[in-house]
């Protein structure tokens, strides 16, 4: 694991989260979303997206499916299509950049 930010999230997932009641209103969970966002968009943008996701995960929101978008955005991803694991998204991201 090269990224210390991902290491911090993994620590939370492994040692802190199991002691807390399940309360994330989205799928994937906010912690997994942050890991995927860091993998997809890098440390700064990925962490920013992860924090934005945590801030919109509260009891007054409906929740639902919210995968990491291929393009950087801080709001809920309107495209609920799963773009596959990180390696697939990375290839898809390259294709999107070529098209646009």
Curated annotation (Swiss-Prot):
Name the predominant localization: membrane
Q: How does it sit in the membrane?
A: Peripheral membrane protein
InterPro entries per the record?
Answer: Membr_insert_effic_factor_YidD (IPR002696)
Q: Which compartment or compartments is the protein found in?
A: Cell membrane
Keyword Cell membrane, does the record have it? yes
Provide one Gene Ontology cellular component. plasma membrane
Which keywords accompany this UniProt record? Answer: Cell membrane, Membrane
Mind telling me which NCBIfam families this protein's record contains?
Answer: membrane protein insertion efficiency factor YidD (TIGR00278)
The record's comment on protein family reads: Belongs to the UPF0161 family.
Cite the PANTHER family for this sequence: MEMBRANE PROTEIN INSERTION EFFICIENCY FACTOR-RELATED (PTHR33383:SF1)
Q: What does this protein do?
A: Could be involved in insertion of integral membrane proteins into the membrane.
Any idea what this protein is called?
A: Putative membrane protein insertion efficiency factor
